[in-house]
Amino acid sequence: MNEELLTVDEVADILRTTPNTIYRWLRAGKLPGVKIGKEWRIRRETLELKLSETNTVIIKDQSLLDNIHPQHDHVMAVTRNTNNLYNLEAEFFKKGLSRGSRLFKGCWWQHPDDVRQELSLRGLPIEELEGKNSLTIVDLTHQYNRSGKNGPIQIWSDEARKTLELGYKTMWGSGSPHLLSCGGHFPNLVDFESSLEDVIRKLPVVGICPYIFETIKDDCFSQLINLMNHHRSVIFYNDGLATYLKNEPA
């Protein structure tokens, strides 16, 4: 049986990105392809499998995201793996776009180019959004290493201000730190989240902080509770099941 091979341009059209991005993914091995002479080809079956792994509807009850305040919120999300985390971020950003908001993505352990790829595979036109300044992606670890907690917090504030200057009313942003993102010390992370909560409550920002907890036991349980106390609500998400809890931070 003959396999259908797609050109780079065809794949770029399907994923709503540019051919240069597809070439970059192919060279990095992030998208499987075959070389025919000097030209790349991607098997349709391979592309469909990749899309089926990442472009699923992750929240069965879409009204769950409607619980997030459309203009001011600071939400913690608890996930089990990177695939769930990217799924949740993608749906969060789609909800923000549907409400006419500007998007902000802060990277801690994630590489910005990986974020672009993963969100593109989940149906977001990343290059188009970045080209219009409707989305900005920033390396927050670099900002933290340079300026401590004030670096990432200042980025959140600056992007919120820029959002208003561009004519938007609200910025929807996602951070997704790791438990050891802030210099390898959990207390530093708690201090950062507490300070971010103080700043976000004064800005037209809907912020979500997705975390990965592969297991919740012993120290992880106390860390989870500690972080929850610095967010106004919490989403628990795992493989298509999600629960939203309203929280009153301590």
For each feature predicted by the language model, list its residue ranges.
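Non-catalytic regulatory/interaction regions at protein termini and inter-domain linkers
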Residues: 2-5, 9-30, 34, 38-48, ...
